[in-house]
């Protein structure tokens, strides 16, 4: 017989209780009442966070769920978060945490091997030991990034400004669709991990920031064209040194960028994406603004490739970026 919807399986109950920090005690009505939140509002927030639908009579919530709802209500009441952005904040946080959780469960599986699936007690014990360490590391890394981002924003931007001129870069793995068909799951996981690790290191070393990675593509942002050029060229150079990764095609565009909830938007982002789509393997294409900013720098060579045929940007001029010989 299958488990009731919204409840963990009996085999996973011990592990879930360990991870959640306590036993399930409440239905969703009871949680909402204890937190002083209408059930409809609580359900909207849970949906934004990507949580599975829970039946009315399912006892799956813990004391931590009550505390979390109360905290969010307090942030809105204190006008730290506008009511209309409540769900957006929850959604953005959940998307980040969901990916982190997938990676962390992968660590558990690699540590325990077959025991992960058959020895629930051991899995729960390992979780009990590892989780506090992971929590401390997450808090440390988050605070470090928060401090760096806050310092950068305070130093470089006008108060309240959401838009500024930056360089957007897209790096895309050539032939990724074919690789998905030909690679095993393990081979594909190693490829993606290697790509993300290499890209993240190169971007950070050259003062950029990885906005997001989506399978075969990494989106990064920098504050000037020279940094973006170094990232793009170094990525292709490093990729060429290894047999583990296919070549990349990269597009760079400079212009106004709107930053919201950790993501970036605007025509500059779209132009960089379009340039990437028409770039040749192991090459870098840049738009007019990036080319103008780099022109005259002895370390780079710019080759006009003329107008490109890309969706939504007719006659978009592009230049191939290379190092000077």
Where are each of the predicted segments found?
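Cytosolic regulatory/linker segments at or just downstream of nucleotide-handling modules
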Residues: 282-325
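Arg/Lys-rich, alpha-helical DNA-contact motif
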Residues: 1-34, 38-156
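Short aromatic/hydrophobic contact patches that present stacked aromatics
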Residues: 217-219, 258, 318
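Catalytic-core segments of nucleotide cyclases and related cyclic-nucleotide turnover enzymes
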Residues: 258-280, 311
